[in-house]
């Protein structure tokens, strides 16, 4: 079997197109963490005092370390977009139920001429509509609760401190503030030396 000579022609041409990525220095990362912690402390100080006591400085430091990886910003923004899309869909479903009721009322008004009979039918329809809306609203709440659960699980698996699956409204409120902090940090540009 003959030896095949190795050439560098192919790699020489492609190396020009490859942008070299430099690993951040430990000093750069440390300064960025200080910057992030400082920002988080500012956000923290804006919270009502009863919430400030529930979010420790240790948690803020862990959060700053976590968001050094910009991937966390991508995850949070994707979850936010999914949440908005789900909410738009659920609003559309709710509006559809309202519109169906209005159409049905209009149809009965055009068919029934006797005011007493119409009043009776519209009363029954109102009861039916109220029950249907209650069932629809219950279903919407269940879907939103599941969405919150999924988001908590995703953020916990991504290693974001302060996130775990809970139904406790106080804990969920804290998590919402942490999400707000992350979104606010995602809009900042860290510039060393400033």
Swiss-Prot record:
Top-rank taxon: Eukaryota
InterPro entries: Gonadal (IPR010849)
Expressing tissues: In stage 6-14 egg chamber nurse cells and oocytes of adult females and spermatocyte cysts and bundles of maturing sperm of larval, pupal and adult males.
Disulfide-bonded cysteines: none
A Pfam family it matches: DGCR6
Protein family (similarity comment): Belongs to the gonadal family.
Protein name in the entry: Gonadal protein gdl
Annotated source species: Drosophila melanogaster (Fruit fly)
Name of the encoding gene: gdl
């Amino acid at each position: 079997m003959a030896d095949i000579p190795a050439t560098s022609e192919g790699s020489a041409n492609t190396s020009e197109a490859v942008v070299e990525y430099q690993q951040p220095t430990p000093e750069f990362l440390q300064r960025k963490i200080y910057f992030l912690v400082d920002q988080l402390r500012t956000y923290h100080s804006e919270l009502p005092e009863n919430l400030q006591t529930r979010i420790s400085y240790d948690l803020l430091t862990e959060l700053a370390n976590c968001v050094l990886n910009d991937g966390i910003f991508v995850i949070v923004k994707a979850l936010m977009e999914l949440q908005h899309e789900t909410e738009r869909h659920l609003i559309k479903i709710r509006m559809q139920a309202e519109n169906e009721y209005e159409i049905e009322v209009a149809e009965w008004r055009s068919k029934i001429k006797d005011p007493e009979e119409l009043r009776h039918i519209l009363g029954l329809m109102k009861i039916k509509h109220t029950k249907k809306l209650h069932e629809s609203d219950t279903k919407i709440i269940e879907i939103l609760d599941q969405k919150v659960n999924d988001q908590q699980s995703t953020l916990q698996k991504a290693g974001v401190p302060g996130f775990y699956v809970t139904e406790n409204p106080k804990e969920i409120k804290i998590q919402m503030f942490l999400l707000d902090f992350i979104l606010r940090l995602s809009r900042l540009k860290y510039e060393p030396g400033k």
